[in-house]
């Protein structure tokens, strides 16, 4: 059996370009395992975040409609938000966000998964 090769990238240089409460941008120069270099690789750092898939008693999904400037449109999306420091857990954050954004609360809650939004560039 072949031994797995090291696939990690080597960070040659790293600098923060912008640091805001909801978003931080870092630029790195990296070297790939094959020796190739990428002089500007951008990484976006976010605080811990939750998304809620809410289903009503009538088996209907709950979405919110919000203007999103990045897209330039009002879009339907899952209820989502940042885990606040005062929240005891991501579950508490999810419950708070759902109530704030939709008025829905209570019900049965379960964690489905923990995933990265876009693991290639987001932390």
Describe the predicted segments one by one.
Residues 24, 47, 57-58, 68-69, ...:
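Active-site segment of metal-dependent pyrophosphate-handling enzymes
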């Amino acid at each position: 059996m072949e031994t797995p090769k090291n696939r990690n990238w080597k960070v040659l240089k790293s600098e923060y370009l912008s640091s805001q409460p909801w978003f931080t941008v870092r630029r790195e120069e990296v070297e790939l395992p094959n020796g190739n270099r990428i002089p500007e690789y951008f990484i976006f750092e976010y605080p811990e975040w939750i998304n809620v898939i809410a289903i009503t008693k009538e088996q209907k999904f709950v979405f919110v409609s919000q203007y999103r400037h990045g897209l330039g449109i009002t879009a339907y999306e899952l209820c989502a938000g940042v885990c606040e420091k005062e929240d005891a857990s991501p579950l508490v954050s999810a419950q708070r966000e759902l109530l704030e954004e939709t008025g829905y609360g209570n019900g049965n809650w379960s964690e489905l998964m923990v995933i990265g939004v876009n693991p290639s560039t987001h932390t």
